[in-house]
Amino acid sequence: MQEMKPIKEGKVREIYDNGDSLIMVATDRISCFDVILNNQVTKKGTVLTQMSKFWFDMTEDILPNHMISVDVKDIPEFFQQEKFDGNSMMCRKLEMLPIECIVRGYITGSGWESYKKTGKVCGIELPEGLKESDKLPEPIYTPSTKAEIGDHDENISYEQSIAHLEKYFPGRGEELAAKLRDNTIALYKKCAEYALSKGIIIADTKFEFGLDKDGNMVIGDEMLTPDSSRFWPAEGYEPGHGQPSFDKQFARDWLKANPDNDWTLPQDIVDKTIGKYLQGYEMLTGKKL
């Protein structure tokens, strides 16, 4: 069996070169506030991979995605080990676009903090009188730049996203920026409507896109996972305060409340976090992992 080494390690994912494709492995690492924590969260990588597959399958009518297979028999022998079972995806190679495409359907998190101070989120004027966790009249698109590990992503305006893309793709900045915005909002609307029918509010999420060898836009990375999104239970939803969630909010809240934490979570917070990931997956897909 040929040993394979990742060509790229992100906060949570490892990418392996497989010739004309890539193998993307979602590890059980967890990151908060752009820092990789010292804990491993068992089954988290499997939730991320299988949930991405679920959404990729659902949205092919809007935009193609980079997934080739999550079936272990389709990928090299090296990945046919227990630690890769369920958390590995064979993907098409893409030229990734240097923008994180964030869409917000509800006002929460950094968006709420910004709105309280300025009445705006990422430069977008919002109606007066919104309460924390309110649904926005329409989803808003708030792009950011992609940071290297250890740096923070930087929110930018739509106009700045055009200029940023133009640096990498001369003559295509405006066209690509518009496609990123329009696809982001279309994907969010379809998936948020479906999730609500299953009892989950998708408050906000982040997509990443790339270009295939023919220059066509394709969804890359992960899609609508608890790592890239805020999922709230629809039951008991009440604006005016923060909402319980099916993501790593338990971890974020504990870290904020315990600033001298050395980036290590207590085991009960780890257990609650994976419990929420699994519950969200089961509600959305109707399947157990």
Annotate the PLM regions:
Residues 1-148, 261-289:
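Active-site loop/lid in soluble adenylation, ligation, and acyl-transfer enzymes
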Residues 21, 96-98, 198-202, 214-217:
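Coil-to-beta-strand transition motifs
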Residues 33, 112-113, 214, 228-230:
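Intrinsically disordered, low-complexity acidic/polar segments
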Residues 103, 202-223:
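Conserved metal-phosphate-binding beta-hairpin within the catalytic cores
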Residues 117-120, 126-175, 219, 223-284:
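Anionic ligand-binding catalytic core segments
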Residues 171-203:
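A long amphipathic alpha-helix within ATP-dependent nucleotide-binding catalytic cores
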